[in-house]
Protein backbone atom coordinates (compact mmCIF):
# COMPACT_ATOMS: atom_id res chain seq x y z
CA UNK A 1 0.00 0.00 0.00
CA UNK A 2 1.43 3.41 -0.95
CA UNK A 3 2.21 6.08 1.62
CA UNK A 4 3.37 8.47 -1.09
CA UNK A 5 1.78 8.19 -4.52
CA UNK A 6 4.02 7.99 -7.60
CA UNK A 7 4.50 11.18 -9.62
CA UNK A 8 2.69 9.61 -12.58
CA UNK A 9 -0.37 8.65 -10.51
CA UNK A 10 -3.62 10.60 -10.43
CA UNK A 11 -3.42 10.07 -6.66
CA UNK A 12 -6.49 9.92 -4.45
CA UNK A 13 -9.78 9.84 -6.32
CA UNK A 14 -13.42 9.71 -5.27
CA UNK A 15 -16.31 8.21 -7.23
CA UNK A 16 -19.45 10.21 -7.98
CA UNK A 17 -22.99 8.89 -8.39
CA UNK A 18 -25.18 10.61 -10.98
CA UNK A 19 -28.92 9.97 -10.98
CA UNK A 20 -30.97 10.03 -14.19
CA UNK A 21 -34.75 10.41 -14.05
CA UNK A 22 -35.38 10.28 -17.81
CA UNK A 23 -36.55 6.80 -18.90
CA UNK A 24 -34.01 4.87 -20.96
CA UNK A 25 -35.55 2.74 -23.69
CA UNK A 26 -33.60 -0.49 -24.12
CA UNK A 27 -32.93 -2.67 -27.16
CA UNK A 28 -35.02 -5.45 -25.60
CA UNK A 29 -38.14 -3.26 -25.67
CA UNK A 30 -38.06 -2.77 -21.91
CA UNK A 31 -37.00 0.44 -20.21
CA UNK A 32 -35.43 1.80 -17.06
CA UNK A 33 -37.57 4.57 -15.58
CA UNK A 34 -34.60 5.89 -13.61
CA UNK A 35 -31.05 4.79 -12.96
CA UNK A 36 -27.70 5.69 -11.42
CA UNK A 37 -24.28 5.80 -13.06
CA UNK A 38 -21.14 5.79 -10.93
CA UNK A 39 -18.16 7.58 -12.44
CA UNK A 40 -14.64 8.74 -11.68
CA UNK A 41 -12.93 11.64 -13.43
CA UNK A 42 -9.25 12.51 -13.73
CA UNK A 43 -7.75 15.76 -14.99
CA UNK A 44 -9.61 18.97 -15.79
CA UNK A 45 -12.18 19.70 -18.50
CA UNK A 46 -10.92 22.63 -20.56
CA UNK A 47 -12.92 25.76 -21.36
CA UNK A 48 -13.99 24.48 -24.79
CA UNK A 49 -14.83 20.96 -23.54
CA UNK A 50 -12.57 19.58 -26.26
CA UNK A 51 -10.25 17.39 -24.17
CA UNK A 52 -12.66 14.77 -22.78
CA UNK A 53 -11.82 11.07 -23.05
CA UNK A 54 -14.28 8.28 -22.21
CA UNK A 55 -12.97 4.99 -20.82
CA UNK A 56 -15.21 1.97 -21.51
CA UNK A 57 -14.60 -1.06 -19.32
CA UNK A 58 -14.53 -4.76 -20.14
CA UNK A 59 -16.61 -7.57 -18.64
CA UNK A 60 -15.50 -7.38 -15.00
CA UNK A 61 -14.35 -3.75 -15.05
CA UNK A 62 -15.80 -0.68 -13.40
CA UNK A 63 -15.37 3.05 -12.85
CA UNK A 64 -12.17 2.81 -10.79
CA UNK A 65 -9.72 2.91 -13.68
CA UNK A 66 -6.85 4.87 -12.10
CA UNK A 67 -5.47 6.16 -8.83
CA UNK A 68 -6.37 5.14 -5.29
CA UNK A 69 -9.44 5.47 -3.10
CA UNK A 70 -7.29 5.58 0.03
CA UNK A 71 -3.67 5.36 1.10
CA UNK A 72 -4.46 1.84 2.33
CA UNK A 73 -5.36 0.54 -1.14
CA UNK A 74 -3.18 -2.40 -2.12
CA UNK A 75 -3.57 -1.75 -5.85
CA UNK A 76 -4.54 1.23 -8.01
CA UNK A 77 -7.38 1.30 -10.55
CA UNK A 78 -7.55 -1.39 -13.22
CA UNK A 79 -5.94 0.70 -16.04
CA UNK A 80 -3.56 2.76 -13.94
CA UNK A 81 -0.67 1.83 -16.23
CA UNK A 82 -2.33 3.84 -19.02
CA UNK A 83 -4.01 6.77 -17.21
CA UNK A 84 -2.16 9.53 -15.39
CA UNK A 85 0.42 12.31 -15.80
CA UNK A 86 2.83 11.36 -18.58
CA UNK A 87 1.02 8.10 -19.32
CA UNK A 88 -0.70 7.28 -22.64
CA UNK A 89 -3.94 8.93 -21.51
CA UNK A 90 -2.18 11.94 -20.03
CA UNK A 91 -4.28 13.64 -17.38
CA UNK A 92 -2.26 16.84 -17.79
CA UNK A 93 -3.88 17.14 -21.23
CA UNK A 94 -7.10 15.17 -21.03
CA UNK A 95 -10.20 15.14 -18.85
CA UNK A 96 -10.85 11.44 -18.38
CA UNK A 97 -14.23 9.92 -17.53
CA UNK A 98 -14.54 6.28 -16.43
CA UNK A 99 -17.86 4.72 -15.47
CA UNK A 100 -19.46 1.55 -14.22
CA UNK A 101 -21.93 0.48 -16.89
CA UNK A 102 -25.62 -0.19 -16.35
CA UNK A 103 -26.08 -3.74 -15.17
CA UNK A 104 -22.78 -3.60 -13.31
CA UNK A 105 -22.26 -4.30 -9.63
CA UNK A 106 -20.08 -1.41 -8.52
CA UNK A 107 -22.68 1.22 -7.76
CA UNK A 108 -24.41 1.85 -11.08
CA UNK A 109 -27.93 0.50 -11.38
CA UNK A 110 -27.82 -3.24 -11.86
CA UNK A 111 -29.23 -6.52 -10.58
CA UNK A 112 -27.81 -5.93 -7.10
CA UNK A 113 -29.47 -2.47 -6.87
CA UNK A 114 -32.82 -1.64 -5.32
CA UNK A 115 -35.68 -1.52 -7.82
CA UNK A 116 -37.39 1.82 -7.04
CA UNK A 117 -40.72 0.39 -8.20
CA UNK A 118 -40.70 -2.41 -5.61
CA UNK A 119 -38.24 -1.39 -2.92
CA UNK A 120 -36.53 -4.76 -3.34
CA UNK A 121 -33.31 -5.84 -5.01
CA UNK A 122 -33.79 -6.22 -8.78
CA UNK A 123 -32.10 -9.61 -8.99
CA UNK A 124 -33.24 -11.41 -12.14
CA UNK A 125 -35.80 -8.64 -12.81
CA UNK A 126 -33.14 -6.21 -14.00
CA UNK A 127 -33.66 -5.89 -17.77
CA UNK A 128 -31.20 -7.14 -20.35
CA UNK A 129 -28.80 -4.44 -21.52
CA UNK A 130 -26.73 -4.32 -24.71
CA UNK A 131 -23.66 -2.46 -25.91
CA UNK A 132 -26.00 -0.07 -27.74
CA UNK A 133 -27.88 0.59 -24.49
CA UNK A 134 -24.63 1.33 -22.68
CA UNK A 135 -23.60 3.80 -25.37
CA UNK A 136 -26.96 5.59 -25.16
CA UNK A 137 -26.59 5.87 -21.38
CA UNK A 138 -23.02 7.13 -21.83
CA UNK A 139 -24.28 9.78 -24.27
CA UNK A 140 -26.66 11.01 -21.56
CA UNK A 141 -23.73 11.04 -19.17
CA UNK A 142 -21.79 13.21 -21.62
CA UNK A 143 -24.74 15.60 -21.83
CA UNK A 144 -24.87 15.82 -18.03
CA UNK A 145 -21.15 16.63 -17.91
CA UNK A 146 -21.43 19.28 -20.63
CA UNK A 147 -19.39 17.29 -23.15
CA UNK A 148 -20.68 17.70 -26.70
CA UNK A 149 -17.95 15.62 -28.31
CA UNK A 150 -15.35 13.20 -26.98
CA UNK A 151 -11.76 13.80 -28.03
CA UNK A 152 -11.50 10.01 -27.82
CA UNK A 153 -13.49 6.99 -26.73
CA UNK A 154 -11.15 4.23 -25.57
CA UNK A 155 -11.66 0.63 -24.53
CA UNK A 156 -10.21 -2.85 -24.58
CA UNK A 157 -12.10 -6.11 -25.20
CA UNK A 158 -15.80 -5.45 -24.47
CA UNK A 159 -14.75 -1.83 -23.91
CA UNK A 160 -13.45 -1.71 -27.48
CA UNK A 161 -16.86 -2.84 -28.71
CA UNK A 162 -18.42 0.11 -26.90
CA UNK A 163 -15.88 2.48 -28.45
CA UNK A 164 -16.72 1.11 -31.89
CA UNK A 165 -20.47 1.40 -31.23
CA UNK A 166 -20.01 5.04 -30.21
CA UNK A 167 -18.70 5.88 -33.68
CA UNK A 168 -21.74 4.20 -35.24
CA UNK A 169 -24.47 5.51 -32.91
CA UNK A 170 -23.08 9.03 -32.44
CA UNK A 171 -20.61 9.66 -35.28
CA UNK A 172 -20.52 13.42 -34.76
CA UNK A 173 -19.67 13.08 -31.06
CA UNK A 174 -16.39 11.11 -31.36
CA UNK A 175 -13.16 12.46 -32.87
CA UNK A 176 -10.97 9.42 -32.18
CA UNK A 177 -11.77 5.78 -31.41
CA UNK A 178 -9.19 3.50 -29.81
CA UNK A 179 -10.38 -0.10 -30.04
CA UNK A 180 -7.93 -2.47 -28.35
CA UNK A 181 -7.91 -6.29 -28.32
CA UNK A 182 -11.49 -6.36 -29.56
CA UNK A 183 -13.70 -7.68 -32.36
CA UNK A 184 -16.67 -6.66 -34.53
CA UNK A 185 -18.68 -9.54 -33.03
CA UNK A 186 -18.04 -12.72 -31.08
CA UNK A 187 -17.04 -15.95 -32.75
CA UNK A 188 -19.02 -19.13 -32.09
CA UNK A 189 -16.18 -20.31 -29.85
CA UNK A 190 -16.38 -17.17 -27.73
CA UNK A 191 -20.15 -17.51 -27.37
CA UNK A 192 -19.56 -21.12 -26.33
CA UNK A 193 -17.11 -20.12 -23.59
CA UNK A 194 -19.64 -17.59 -22.30
CA UNK A 195 -22.38 -20.21 -22.27
CA UNK A 196 -20.24 -22.63 -20.25
CA UNK A 197 -19.61 -19.84 -17.73
CA UNK A 198 -23.32 -19.01 -17.54
CA UNK A 199 -24.25 -22.65 -17.04
CA UNK A 200 -21.82 -22.85 -14.13
CA UNK A 201 -23.78 -20.04 -12.46
CA UNK A 202 -27.27 -21.17 -13.48
CA UNK A 203 -26.67 -24.70 -12.21
CA UNK A 204 -25.48 -23.55 -8.78
CA UNK A 205 -28.24 -24.53 -6.28
CA UNK A 206 -27.79 -21.18 -4.55
CA UNK A 207 -28.49 -19.14 -7.69
CA UNK A 208 -32.23 -19.56 -7.00
CA UNK A 209 -33.37 -18.26 -10.36
CA UNK A 210 -31.45 -15.02 -9.82
CA UNK A 211 -33.20 -14.11 -6.55
CA UNK A 212 -30.45 -15.38 -4.27
CA UNK A 213 -29.98 -12.06 -2.46
CA UNK A 214 -33.51 -12.26 -1.07
CA UNK A 215 -32.48 -15.50 0.62
CA UNK A 216 -29.16 -14.13 1.87
CA UNK A 217 -27.00 -16.51 -0.16
CA UNK A 218 -24.48 -16.17 -3.01
CA UNK A 219 -23.90 -18.70 -5.82
CA UNK A 220 -20.17 -18.67 -5.09
CA UNK A 221 -19.51 -22.10 -6.56
CA UNK A 222 -20.97 -21.12 -9.93
CA UNK A 223 -19.23 -17.74 -10.01
CA UNK A 224 -15.94 -19.38 -9.09
CA UNK A 225 -16.19 -21.88 -11.94
CA UNK A 226 -17.29 -19.18 -14.40
CA UNK A 227 -14.27 -17.07 -13.51
CA UNK A 228 -11.90 -20.01 -13.75
CA UNK A 229 -13.12 -20.79 -17.27
CA UNK A 230 -12.90 -17.15 -18.28
CA UNK A 231 -9.47 -16.66 -16.80
CA UNK A 232 -8.02 -19.53 -18.82
CA UNK A 233 -9.15 -17.79 -22.01
CA UNK A 234 -7.59 -14.47 -20.98
CA UNK A 235 -4.10 -15.99 -20.78
CA UNK A 236 -1.97 -17.52 -23.52
CA UNK A 237 -0.44 -20.98 -23.34
CA UNK A 238 2.99 -19.31 -23.31
CA UNK A 239 2.02 -17.08 -20.39
CA UNK A 240 0.62 -19.97 -18.38
CA UNK A 241 3.65 -22.09 -19.19
CA UNK A 242 6.08 -19.38 -18.13
CA UNK A 243 4.16 -18.57 -14.95
CA UNK A 244 3.32 -22.09 -13.79
CA UNK A 245 4.62 -24.80 -16.10
CA UNK A 246 4.00 -28.10 -14.36
CA UNK A 247 5.32 -26.86 -11.04
CA UNK A 248 3.79 -28.65 -8.07
CA UNK A 249 2.22 -26.93 -5.10
CA UNK A 250 2.73 -30.07 -3.07
CA UNK A 251 6.07 -31.78 -2.49
CA UNK A 252 5.00 -34.73 -4.61
CA UNK A 253 1.98 -36.09 -6.46
CA UNK A 254 -0.68 -37.45 -4.12
CA UNK A 255 -2.46 -39.64 -6.65
CA UNK A 256 -5.96 -38.67 -5.53
CA UNK A 257 -8.83 -36.71 -7.02
CA UNK A 258 -9.16 -34.02 -4.37
CA UNK A 259 -5.72 -32.52 -3.75
CA UNK A 260 -4.63 -29.24 -5.30
CA UNK A 261 -1.31 -30.46 -6.63
CA UNK A 262 -0.25 -28.09 -9.42
CA UNK A 263 0.46 -24.38 -9.01
CA UNK A 264 -1.86 -23.57 -11.91
CA UNK A 265 -4.73 -25.32 -10.11
CA UNK A 266 -4.10 -23.27 -7.00
CA UNK A 267 -3.94 -20.05 -9.01
CA UNK A 268 -7.23 -20.68 -10.80
CA UNK A 269 -8.98 -21.61 -7.58
CA UNK A 270 -7.70 -18.45 -5.91
CA UNK A 271 -8.80 -16.25 -8.83
CA UNK A 272 -12.23 -17.87 -8.84
CA UNK A 273 -12.67 -17.61 -5.09
CA UNK A 274 -11.61 -13.95 -4.98
CA UNK A 275 -13.91 -13.07 -7.88
CA UNK A 276 -16.88 -14.80 -6.27
CA UNK A 277 -16.62 -12.53 -3.22
CA UNK A 278 -16.81 -9.25 -5.16
CA UNK A 279 -18.88 -9.81 -8.31
CA UNK A 280 -22.61 -10.31 -8.80
CA UNK A 281 -23.78 -13.47 -10.54
CA UNK A 282 -26.65 -11.75 -12.38
CA UNK A 283 -24.25 -9.07 -13.61
CA UNK A 284 -21.96 -11.78 -14.97
CA UNK A 285 -24.86 -13.27 -16.91
CA UNK A 286 -25.87 -9.86 -18.29
CA UNK A 287 -22.34 -8.88 -19.30
CA UNK A 288 -21.66 -12.12 -21.15
CA UNK A 289 -24.99 -11.83 -22.98
CA UNK A 290 -24.14 -8.24 -23.99
CA UNK A 291 -20.93 -9.62 -25.48
CA UNK A 292 -22.84 -12.33 -27.35
CA UNK A 293 -25.42 -9.90 -28.74
CA UNK A 294 -22.94 -7.32 -30.08
CA UNK A 295 -23.09 -7.41 -33.88
CA UNK A 296 -23.48 -3.91 -35.38
CA UNK A 297 -23.24 -5.20 -38.94
CA UNK A 298 -26.38 -7.33 -38.50
CA UNK A 299 -28.53 -4.25 -39.14
CA UNK A 300 -26.68 -3.64 -42.41
CA UNK A 301 -26.96 -7.02 -44.10
CA UNK A 302 -23.92 -8.32 -42.20
CA UNK A 303 -21.81 -5.86 -44.20
CA UNK A 304 -19.27 -4.24 -41.87
CA UNK A 305 -18.12 -1.82 -44.57
CA UNK A 306 -21.66 -0.45 -44.95
CA UNK A 307 -21.96 -0.31 -41.17
CA UNK A 308 -18.91 1.93 -40.91
CA UNK A 309 -19.57 4.18 -43.90
CA UNK A 310 -21.16 6.85 -41.71
CA UNK A 311 -18.48 7.05 -39.01
CA UNK A 312 -16.52 10.29 -38.72
CA UNK A 313 -13.83 9.39 -36.18
CA UNK A 314 -10.21 8.52 -36.81
CA UNK A 315 -9.37 5.04 -35.55
CA UNK A 316 -6.51 3.33 -33.77
CA UNK A 317 -6.69 -0.44 -33.37
CA UNK A 318 -4.21 -2.56 -31.45
CA UNK A 319 -4.07 -6.32 -31.00
CA UNK A 320 -1.70 -8.80 -29.38
CA UNK A 321 -0.05 -11.78 -31.05
CA UNK A 322 -0.93 -14.39 -28.41
CA UNK A 323 -4.49 -13.20 -27.76
CA UNK A 324 -6.65 -16.13 -28.84
CA UNK A 325 -9.86 -14.82 -27.25
CA UNK A 326 -9.85 -11.77 -29.55
CA UNK A 327 -7.14 -12.63 -32.03
CA UNK A 328 -5.36 -10.09 -34.27
CA UNK A 329 -7.45 -11.40 -37.18
CA UNK A 330 -10.57 -10.00 -35.49
CA UNK A 331 -9.03 -6.52 -35.25
CA UNK A 332 -7.95 -6.76 -38.88
CA UNK A 333 -11.59 -7.37 -39.87
CA UNK A 334 -12.40 -3.92 -38.49
CA UNK A 335 -9.28 -2.37 -40.05
CA UNK A 336 -10.06 -3.82 -43.49
CA UNK A 337 -13.66 -2.60 -43.30
CA UNK A 338 -12.54 0.90 -42.32
CA UNK A 339 -10.06 1.02 -45.19
CA UNK A 340 -12.75 -0.15 -47.61
CA UNK A 341 -15.05 2.55 -46.22
CA UNK A 342 -12.24 5.11 -46.82
CA UNK A 343 -11.77 6.00 -43.15
CA UNK A 344 -8.58 7.00 -41.35
CA UNK A 345 -7.21 4.07 -39.39
CA UNK A 346 -3.93 3.11 -37.71
CA UNK A 347 -3.23 -0.48 -36.70
CA UNK A 348 -0.54 -2.16 -34.64
CA UNK A 349 -0.15 -5.84 -33.82
CA UNK A 350 1.99 -6.10 -30.71
CA UNK A 351 4.22 -9.08 -30.00
CA UNK A 352 3.33 -9.96 -26.41
CA UNK A 353 3.17 -13.31 -24.60
CA UNK A 354 0.42 -12.37 -22.12
CA UNK A 355 -2.63 -13.27 -24.22
CA UNK A 356 -5.88 -11.29 -24.07
CA UNK A 357 -4.98 -9.68 -20.75
CA UNK A 358 -2.05 -7.93 -22.47
CA UNK A 359 -4.21 -4.84 -23.01
CA UNK A 360 -4.15 -4.33 -19.23
CA UNK A 361 -0.38 -4.76 -18.92
CA UNK A 362 2.43 -2.14 -18.93
CA UNK A 363 4.09 -3.57 -22.05
CA UNK A 364 6.66 -0.99 -23.27
CA UNK A 365 5.89 -1.16 -27.00
CA UNK A 366 2.16 -1.04 -26.29
CA UNK A 367 2.47 1.98 -24.01
CA UNK A 368 4.75 3.71 -26.51
CA UNK A 369 2.32 3.20 -29.40
CA UNK A 370 -0.65 4.16 -27.22
CA UNK A 371 1.12 7.37 -26.14
CA UNK A 372 2.17 8.15 -29.69
CA UNK A 373 -1.41 8.07 -30.92
CA UNK A 374 -2.90 9.98 -27.99
CA UNK A 375 -0.24 12.69 -28.30
CA UNK A 376 -1.45 13.37 -31.85
CA UNK A 377 -4.93 14.26 -30.65
CA UNK A 378 -5.39 18.02 -30.59
CA UNK A 379 -7.30 19.46 -27.67
From Swiss-Prot:
Main location group: cytoplasm
Catalysed reaction, written as an equation: L-homoserine + succinyl-CoA = O-succinyl-L-homoserine + CoA
Cross-referenced InterPro entries: AB_hydrolase_1, AB_hydrolase_fold, HAT_MetX-like
Keywords: Acyltransferase, Amino-acid biosynthesis, Cytoplasm, Methionine biosynthesis, Transferase
Pathway: Amino-acid biosynthesis; L-methionine biosynthesis via de novo pathway; O-succinyl-L-homoserine from L-homoserine: step 1/1
Pfam family, one: Abhydrolase_1
List of catalytic residues: 157 (nucleophile), 323, 356
GO cellular component: cytoplasm
Regions crossing the membrane: none
Enzyme Commission (EC) number: 2.3.1.46
Coiled coil: none
PANTHER family tied to this protein: HOMOSERINE O-ACETYLTRANSFERASE
Role description: Transfers a succinyl group from succinyl-CoA to L-homoserine, forming succinyl-L-homoserine.
Subunit structure: Homodimer.
Name of the protein this chain belongs to: Homoserine O-succinyltransferase
Biological source species: Pseudomonas paraeruginosa (strain DSM 24068 / PA7) (Pseudomonas aeruginosa (strain PA7))
